[in-house]
Amino acid sequence: MAAKDVIFGGEARARMVEGVNILANAVKVTLGPKGRNVVLERSFGAPTVTKDGVSVAKEIELKDKLQNMGAQMVKEVASKTSDIAGDGTTTATVLAQAIVHEGMKYVAAGMNPMDLKRGIDKAVHALVEELKKASKATTTSKEIAQVGSISANSDETIGKIIADAMDKVGKEGVITVEDGKSLESELDVVEGMQFDRGYLSPYFINNPEKQSALLDNPFVLLYDKKISNIRDLLPTLEQVAKAGRPLLIIAEEVEGEALATLVVNTLRGILKVVAVKAPGFGDRRKAMLEDIAVLTGGKVIAEEVGMSLEKVTLADLGQAKRIEVGKENTIIIDGSGEAADIEARVKQVRVQIEEATSDYDREKLQERVAKLAGGVAVIKVGAATEVEMKEKKARVEDALHATRAAVEEGIVAGGGVALLRAKQTAGVIKGDNADQDAGIKLVLRAIEAPLREIVYNAGGEASVVVNAVLAGTGNYGFNAANDTYGDMIEMGILDPTKVTRTALQNAASVASLMLTTECMVCESAKDDAPAGGMGGGMGGMGGMGDMGM
């Protein structure tokens, strides 16, 4: 086992704070509308240019082990905030640095770090309650667009695209971000339910231009086993042919004689039918077939529940307004399922989401909810170069997380104003002793840090602006983009409550741990001197000629 260095007290904390400052100073240059970019080296390809706090934090590893321990703890603040709220990573880092900076003065003055921590916790709890009271629900598309714009570094086009996407697929819908193929960012919305299975034979195509099969007002047969014998299907096909409507068959597999007969009948124009494989595998396949049944108002024909193909009636089949089947995807538009049944199914899947233990399961369940509830939107990010594409895509993803957070917990005034107002409205927060009071006081001073940093990055005088904002009331604050004062919400400068709350809680949590640190243990720096070898080699042996042979 390698030897370890053990460092105590003030020296340990000082080295840790140096690491905190290095990381926080690199991250905080990105804060605010006039924040700067950070360029990150890549082992191959072009460097990445970013204005995303957590991306910068993740890249930083320091050579000095003690400094690195401090930096990694602050990195945890940014990562945790990003995981929970999806944004606010730079704010969280700035707050953590400010709380550590203020707190270390009190620790050096001999105050009890544990009482300071208790004071910090009391202050944070009071401030979070005030933020919740000040929070306003997001109701309009305009507010969602404003939240997205602020998070995407004041890019209004990104905010508008996200608001449009939420309008089209609902606030619970799935919105994904992909690389675009043009210079402009675009929104592509898939209405209805889409699953990744296409036609089983190209002979089903009836729309050669799109290379797809279009079915208007079709019946939908859902079967959870293989279909290889056409005799099992005949009763259903005869009933559908009499009704004069098309049919979509979704089964585990349609093969052999059954598939050949369906193709021949389609080519002869006797029947308009398309067969596709059921989506998913195993239990997930059964669940997705059940989803499609609820959406189309049909039943899954399963032998386990005593149903067989030969006895299927038209009442057992689902229906939809239109179905489009491509080579790789099937889209069911406007299924005939009852709204109440669909809602009940969505609730059922949501319960499963809450109980899911793995991220993969949770993601797949959320996709099912979106498909049932209204569709999927794809934002295709356009840019001139790959470097710009990466940077822009990261901003769109941040903005998307921020808008989701705003929908969840509402919004507060942006630009660091919400924290200052929470400090004013929280009134007098009392600790149990002088050291706890000091902990409360240091948090109330530290929460000015985000506004100070925004002003500093915009080239202004931080103290003047902070005093001017504190002299105002409500949403009155400073717009650093154009150096004006006014109502932040009216000016469209909003922050999701969840982002501000999470940033404060995570920053205080990690900063408290640092203040209560008394000892650090790390591997000893390796001695760089070369290991003692065999001296200058086997000197003195001379050449073979010296041996007189």
From Swiss-Prot:
It comes from the Bacteria. One of its GO terms (biological process) is protein refolding. Pfam families: Cpn60_TCP1 (PF00118). GO terms for molecular function: ATP binding; ATP-dependent protein folding chaperone; isomerase activity; unfolded protein binding. Gene3D superfamilies: GroEL (3.50.7.10), GroEL-like equatorial domain (1.10.560.10), TCP-1-like chaperonin intermediate domain (3.30.260.10). Its EC number is 5.6.1.7. PROSITE patterns: CHAPERONINS_CPN60. ATP binds at residues 30-33, 51, 87-91, 415, 479-481, 495. The keyword ATP-binding applies. It is found in: Cytoplasm. Forms a cylinder of 14 subunits composed of two heptameric rings stacked back-to-back. Interacts with the co-chaperonin GroES. NCBIfam families: GroEL, PRK00013.1, PRK12849.1, PRK12850.1, PRK12851.1. This is Chaperonin GroEL 2. The gene is groEL2.
